[in-house]
Amino acid sequence: MSAPRRIKIPTCALVGVIASVDELRLAPGMRAPPDLFELRLDHLPNLRESQLLKLRQPLIITARHPAEGGKKVRSARRDLLLKFLPRAKFVDVELRSLRELGPVWDEARRLHVGRICSFHDFKRTPEPAVLHKKLLRARKAGADVFKVVTRAEDFHDLLTLFELLWSELASMRLCVMASGKFGPISRLFFRDAGSSLIYAPLRHPLHHGQLTFQELRGQRDF
């Protein structure tokens, strides 16, 4: 596969996650919005294109696989993503879903939509060699960003994620965060360590260890 394109991202972009109707209503009126909004289409299966017109910030669209924290939906994930792809700045597709969502991945490239390839493990943090292999697969697939979220319950887990971020920054853009006990500190620490994106739900955390948008904005100079 060809080398990934360099999609322009701020040094560390703050992503506000919209995964509920009330968050969708909140977003347009925010005085200090995040750099991007992530639309969790698996939580918003009835979303209409007209509702996006009020969102001023660039959009990441995601229809998360149930095995990686997504919500089961009646509509095919592929159809949801293709519907909103023309309005997106980025699309997020799990590494495990590259074959299933191949048409989405290819269409994103055709439309010059940035491609985030992601991996989530909310039970543990895999060994460094496992994470490195997944990064290589994402890079081979042409991802603009490789996103990793794993459960970190001790300092060793946090260090594993930091080492991945620090050692691989030269090879491609990375978004690295933790869930669990060390989730909150990872969102502060990894921002300064080089993570391209840091996510925060506008109101409702989806996983243990997430900081809401207001909690994150209240820390330092986010």
Regions found by a protein language model. Give the residues of each.
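A broad, low-specificity signal for short, low-complexity segments enriched in glycine/proline
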Residues: 1-3, 55, 76-79, 107-109, ...
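Conserved N-terminal beta1-alpha1 strand-loop-helix module at the mouth
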Residues: 1-76
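Catalytic beta/alpha-barrel core
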Residues: 17-18, 34-45, 62-64, 69, ...
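Short, solvent-exposed coil/turn linker segments
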Residues: 20-22, 94, 212
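Alpha/beta enzyme core
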Residues: 24-32, 78-86, 135-141
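Short glycine/proline-enriched coil/turn segments at helix->beta-strand junctions
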Residues: 32-35, 54-58, 86-89, 111-113, ...
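Catalytic-core regions built around general acid/base machinery
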Residues: 50-56, 83, 104-110
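Catalytic alpha/beta core domains of metabolic enzymes, predominantly
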Residues: 97-222
